[in-house]
Amino acid sequence: MGVRSPLSASGPRGAAVLVLLLLGVALCSAVEEKKVCQGTNNKLTQLGHVEDHFTSLQRMYNNCEVVLSNLEITYVEHNRDLTFLKTIQEVAGYVLIALNMVDVIPLENLQIIRGNVLYDNSFALAVLSNYHMNKTQGLRELPMKRLSEILNGGVKISNNPKLCNMDTVLWNDIIDTSRKPLTVLDFASNLSSCPKCHPNCTEDHCWGAGEQNCQTLTKVICAQQCSGRCRGKVPSDCCHNQCAAGCTGPRESDCLACRKFRDDATCKDTCPPLVLYNPTTYQMDVNPEGKYSFGATCVRECPHNYVVTDHGSCVRSCNTDTYEVEENGVRKCKKCDGLCSKVCNGIGIGELKGILSINATNIDSFKNCTKINGDVSILPVAFLGDAFTKTLPLDPKKLDVFRTVKEISGFLLIQAWPDNATDLYAFENLEIIRGRTKQHGQYSLAVVNLKIQSLGLRSLKEISDGDIAIMKNKNLCYADTMNWRSLFATQSQKTKIIQNRNKNDCTADRHVCDPLCSDVGCWGPGPFHCFSCRFFSRQKECVKQCNILQGEPREFERDSKCLPCHSECLVQNSTAYNTTCSGPGPDHCMKCAHFIDGPHCVKACPAGVLGENDTLVWKYADANAVCQLCHPNCTRGCKGPGLEGCPNGSKTPSIAAGVVGGLLCLVVVGLGIGLYLRRRHIVRKRTLRRLLQERELVEPLTP
């Protein structure tokens, strides 16, 4: 059946619909574009001079509607204009009002304090010591007339001698008493001089003088049927359970504020997910209606200077196990492959400017570094110490900090190394030497006068600029086997490999490349130090063959690399010709270790996975371990096909129904028996009366 577009309707009705649609669009835009501000976490710290402190406060909250962290109003002088605070509607953290001398703080549109962060670990609202030392000036009014909800945390009001009407506020209607929050209410001593609530205020609850400051109660007046807030006393006035601070109607789109997330004009438990399970392709597809969570709001795009996490949240910085990257124009937090990058200054840069060598004083600054901006120079003075600068000798164990380094932007110069070390083990993960600065303007790699037997730089793949010098290392072998040209980025780069151990002596002592290494050389002994492999490679080791038909773990071969099969692939041992997998991932298995879901091997069939139209996808495994869709009426999974496969419901409702039914039957039977006995009694009584009457008629008269 066709549906006529409201925009094509004619006459007044069509015009009215058009106006309503336009208003709806405008409303959604307004909701979506609420201005947010970061907030502060300074507590009672004053930011410079009092004038600068106020300017910072004004700049932060001007036109702000949603505060992402804490709202801290402190050190405001008398006669300051704070009208810029009127726009604030929501605070995610706590509200701190302290050490102010101003008469009025007009937070008149503040509706909700979420309390995600609490002041002093206890309070979502703290109003403290707002007065001048002479007590002639101080905070007198705090008209938060729309504040209806504090989701977490208590209230502390203390030492405000001029502040009125805090005692006339029904705080139990605002705070979540079920959490038993700490509440400290120390009201002013001169309450008798404070203005009374307007006569129209409910039970004399107000934020100040006048009817406009009456407190609107949204919880204690609610009917028992209400699960949260309400707008009146009857059951039909209950708010939706996603509402916070009250509502104008029963729907989730009628909330004054949202308990968890706001999606356009609707309150929801979660934002629309970014991906959904596709039962046709058996994969997770991008949800065109998906949104990111930004504070308590669902947004199409994260704001400027925010990055996106895997969970679909907008954050200011990535976690320590992720790094920031741009993909398709979106800044994302991507899982690090191993240790996350940490960039450190090298010799000659920043705090190490003017330093000649790595030493016991500065080596700890390279801990967990993956990239060094600058140079790395290890000179003999490092292990000798320096009496003049009172620098102790370097502990050789400290050199392990360089195991995380993958890139050096300058040069690597090593003129001293532990005598018992056979190679440059600390730099085994170094991949690139950029050579943007060079030793003596020429060398980007220099290894001189060491006792090592091999270089051991097995991860080095590129020397971008500069020459190399491997000199005067009397025990060093392998260096002249390398095809250094394959590491260079320019044709002008040169090598200087002289005065190391004689090649014939190296061969005689079997200090030669492993047979599994290719002819382009090696960094040291064994299959782990090959520059490239003759046959296949498994991670950093050269091997003769991959574990395709036997061995653990089972593998497949690609580009001369042995790569592991997915863990959901069933290992094949039945014949000598069966491979376990043909490629990466769970969709290239020859057989599945557990179950099959479409083309994929899975550990378990989908159970309650979110699919299209917010429906949950449930599947069961058939006799062939293939995942099949449950019957649509099986809303909690199934064990087989059809309705018969649905799990039996909980026995508790059945027992309850049986008990109620049994009691009802007893009542009915009891009533039936009672009625029967009563009727029988009435019949007997009537019979007896009739017999008596008949006896009177036939009885002879006595003379």
Curated annotation (Swiss-Prot):
Extracellular side: 31-654
Matching Gene3D superfamilies: 6.10.250.2930, Hormone Receptor, Insulin-like Growth Factor Receptor 1, Chain A, domain 2 (2.10.220.10), Receptor L-domain (3.80.20.20)
Bilayer-crossing regions: 655-667
Membrane protein topology class: Single-pass type I membrane protein
Any one GO CC term of the record: nuclear membrane
Keyword Signal: yes
Assigned keywords, A-Z: ATP-binding, Cell membrane, Disulfide bond, Endoplasmic reticulum, Endosome, Glycoprotein, Golgi apparatus, Kinase, Membrane, Nucleotide-binding, Nucleus, Phosphoprotein, Receptor, Signal, Transferase, Transmembrane, Transmembrane helix, Tyrosine-protein kinase
MF (Gene Ontology): ATP binding; protein tyrosine kinase activity; transmembrane receptor protein tyrosine kinase activity
Post-translational events: Phosphorylated. Autophosphorylates.
Keyword Hydrolase: no
Sugar-bearing residue positions: N134, N190, N200, N359, N368, N420, N573, N578, N613, N633, N648
Subcellular location: Cell membrane; Endoplasmic reticulum membrane; Golgi apparatus membrane; Nucleus membrane
SMART domains according to UniProt: FU
Ranges facing Cytoplasmic side: 668-703
Protein's name in the database: Epidermal growth factor receptor
Organism: Gallus gallus
Species lineage: Eukaryota, Metazoa, Chordata, Craniata, Vertebrata
